[in-house]
Design a protein with these regions (language model features):
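Post-signal peptide N-terminal segment of mature Sec-exported envelope proteins
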Residues: 29-51
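Short amphipathic, basic-aromatic surface patches that mediate peripheral association
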Residues: 61-68
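Bacterial signal peptide processing site
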Residues: 22-25
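Short coil-to-beta strand junction motifs in C2/discoidin
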Residues: 70-77, 144-146
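Bacterial N-terminal signal peptides that target proteins for export
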Residues: 1-10
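Noncatalytic modules at the cell exterior or secretory-pathway interfaces
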Residues: 53-61, 121-137
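An anionic, turn-rich surface loop/hairpin at beta-sheet edges
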Residues: 92-122
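C-terminal motif of bacterial Sec signal peptides marking the signal peptidase cleavage site
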Residues: 17-20
């Protein structure tokens, strides 16, 4: 009987510890890209509402593609302005969609979903973000891009860079 109580206590401790490391999603939204594809001049805008808590956050860019996307990679340009501070960040992401063996790295069957780390940032309670994202490919119109999204997650633990 004592061993089973100890086992249950250990299991509960493990579950609580793992649960404490979870990230809380503060914002998650997609913008649809109209046919025939994502135009280089079509910058997508996201207005992330004020965060409820001060803390460390992780910004992710997300893509949904279909079989019509013609390349193995895509380069994304992400610019962010934290309001009211006015601090701006500019990130260039070189995103691999298909590996060297021709295997799609996204999740899905007819549409493939990808997530790419943009940056970690420290935000204060009430900070909001205006974010713009565009592609930086030589081809003007990128077929096969269905949706572009942004996810902001609050990080519970770990170190953060504030670049």
């Amino acid at each position: 009987m004592r061993n089973s109580r100890l086992a249950i206590a250990c299991l509960l401790t493990l579950l609580l510890t793992l649960g404490a490391c979870q990230s809380e999603v503060a914002y998650h939204h997609y913008r649809h890209v109209s046919s025939p594809g994502w135009d280089k001049s079509d910058t997508l805008h996201f207005n992330i509402p004020p965060v409820r808590e001060s803390g460390n956050y992780e910004m992710l860019a997300e893509l949904r593609t279909d079989k019509n996307y013609p390349f193995h990679k895509i380069t994304l340009i992400v610019s962010q302005t934290v309001i009211p501070e006015g601090k701006s960040f500019y990130d260039r992401l070189d995103c691999r969609l298909i590996n060297q063996n021709g295997v799609i790295e996204g999740d899905g069957i007819s549409y493939f979903q990808y997530q790419f780390h943009v940056r970690d940032m420290k935000l204060n309670k009430g900070d909001s973000i205006h974010l713009c994202i565009s592609h930086n490919m030589k081809r003007e119109i990128m077929p096969g891009i269905a949706d572009v999204g942004i996810c902001l997650k609050q990080k519970e633990t770990g170190r953060i860079s504030d670049e």
